[in-house]
């Protein structure tokens, strides 16, 4: 199945000059969504890990079925003020400003092996912020997986020494 056929391109969103890759047609199609999750799960099956860490909001869409399918725990990472317990945080640069991610301070135990999951790997900024959060908690990131990788933004220059799984590449 050609998963790119289920991605909608939206030019100039969220700002002029950006080509937004919309995953909603893929996730609303049961066959395409299942195929995408199964493809990522098969690759992740090669790694020994305990937990999946993912950012809101679209990261949850990809990570939750993977956690279920692979029988792994899921650690949601959220924007400030969204988690009810004590958190650790990381501030990072975006294309158009700064962002902050929070994770419960007890979400990851020392030496737990973790995989980072998100919908799109663009510049690598969010993935690196997630990696720093995992490491602050004492965890070890063993791999990362995304539905889409925007290779033209060169995220692998930022995410070094970390396996990257992405069935759709632009």
Curated annotation (Swiss-Prot):
Localization (cell): Cytoplasm
Key words of the record: Cytoplasm, Glycosyltransferase, Purine salvage, Transferase
EC annotation from Swiss-Prot or TrEMBL: 2.4.2.7
Protein's recorded name: Adenine phosphoribosyltransferase
Record-linked Gene3D superfamilies: 3.40.50.2020
Annotated InterPro entries: Ade_phspho_trans (IPR005764), PRibTrfase_dom (IPR000836), PRTase-like (IPR029057), UPRTase/APRTase (IPR050054)
NCBIfam families: apt, PRK02304.1-2, PRK02304.1-3, PRK02304.1-5
EC top class named in words: transferase
GO cellular component terms given for this protein: cytoplasm
Organism, scientific name: Fervidobacterium nodosum (strain ATCC 35602 / DSM 5306 / Rt17-B1)
Catalytic activity: AMP + diphosphate = 5-phospho-alpha-D-ribose 1-diphosphate + adenine
């Amino acid at each position: 199945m050609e998963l790119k056929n289920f991605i909608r391109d939206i030019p100039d969103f969220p700002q002029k000059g950006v080509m937004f890759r919309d995953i909603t047609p893929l996730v609303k199609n049961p066959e395409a969504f299942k195929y995408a999750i199964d493809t990522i799960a098969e690759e992740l099956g090669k790694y020994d890990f305990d937990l999946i860490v993912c950012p809101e909001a679209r990261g949850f869409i990809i990570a939750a079925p993977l956690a279920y399918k692979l029988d792994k725990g899921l650690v949601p990472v959220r924007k400030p003020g969204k988690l009810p317990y004590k958190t650790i945080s990381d501030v990072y640069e975006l294309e158009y400003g700064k962002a902050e991610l929070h994770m419960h301070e007890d979400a990851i135990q020392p030496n737990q092996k973790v995989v980072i999951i998100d919908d799109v790997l663009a510049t690598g900024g969010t993935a690196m912020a997630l990696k720093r959060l995992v490491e602050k908690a004492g965890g070890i990131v063993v791999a990362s997986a995304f539905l889409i990788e925007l290779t033209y933004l060169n995220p692998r220059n930022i995410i070094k020494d970390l396996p990257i799984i992405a069935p759709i590449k632009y």
